[in-house]
């Protein structure tokens, strides 16, 4: 049996993601942190960045968010974000469009050039894989 954890990502526009995942890496305000099933309960502030979702089949999905909060329990993660863009698509042009939207969202929320460079690098690397 795989140790999966429930993940929900919600914005003011509604549910962006809901499912069982293997792990999640979140852009915490004090740095990135990973969550697996059985993690200690916590509430954390999130900064603009990328949520890296590792699914049960070990594939990764990325969702760019602006600031928000995460509530972590042993078997569930709930992310409340001001805005989010799913960085995936069915073809190359859709992926490029979503990637540009994700970069615009993050750029509008951050003035930290070093943090922007790291986030954009993560998005660009994910597109190539």
From Swiss-Prot:
UniProt cross-references to NCBIfam families, sorted A to Z: ATP_synt_epsi
Function: Produces ATP from ADP in the presence of a proton gradient across the membrane.
Record family assignment: Belongs to the ATPase epsilon chain family.
Domain of life assignment: Bacteria
Protein's UniProt name: ATP synthase epsilon chain
Cellular component GO terms held in the UniProt record: plasma membrane; proton-transporting ATP synthase complex
Lineage: Bacteria, Pseudomonadati, Campylobacterota, Epsilonproteobacteria, Campylobacterales
Gene that encodes the chain: atpC
Alphabetical list of Pfam families matching this protein: ATP-synt_DE_N
UniProt keywords, alphabetically: ATP synthesis, Cell inner membrane, Cell membrane, CF(1), Hydrogen ion transport, Ion transport, Membrane, Transport
Oligomeric and partner information: F-type ATPases have 2 components, CF(1) - the catalytic core - and CF(0) - the membrane proton channel. CF(1) has five subunits: alpha(3), beta(3), gamma(1), delta(1), epsilon(1). CF(0) has three main subunits: a, b and c.
Disulfide bonds listed in the record: none
Membrane topology: Peripheral membrane protein
Localization in the cell: Cell inner membrane
GO molecular function: ATP binding; proton-transporting ATP synthase activity, rotational mechanism
Keyword Transport: yes
């Amino acid at each position: 049996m795989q140790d999966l954890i429930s993940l929900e990502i919600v914005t003011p526009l509604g549910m962006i993601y809901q499912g069982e995942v293997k792990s999640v890496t979140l852009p915490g305000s004090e740095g990135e942190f990973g969550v697996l099933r059985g993690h200690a309960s916590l509430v954390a502030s999130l900064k603009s960045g990328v949520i890296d979702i590792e699914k049960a089949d070990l594939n990764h999905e990325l969702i760019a968010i602006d600031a928000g909060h995460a509530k972590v329990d042993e078997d569930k993660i709930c992310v409340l974000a001001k805005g989010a863009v799913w960085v995936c698509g069915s073809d190359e042009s859709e992926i490029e469009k979503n990637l540009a939207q994700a970069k615009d969202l993050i750029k509008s929320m951050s003035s930290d050039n070093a943090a922007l460079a790291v986030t954009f690098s993560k998005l660009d690397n994910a597109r190539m894989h």
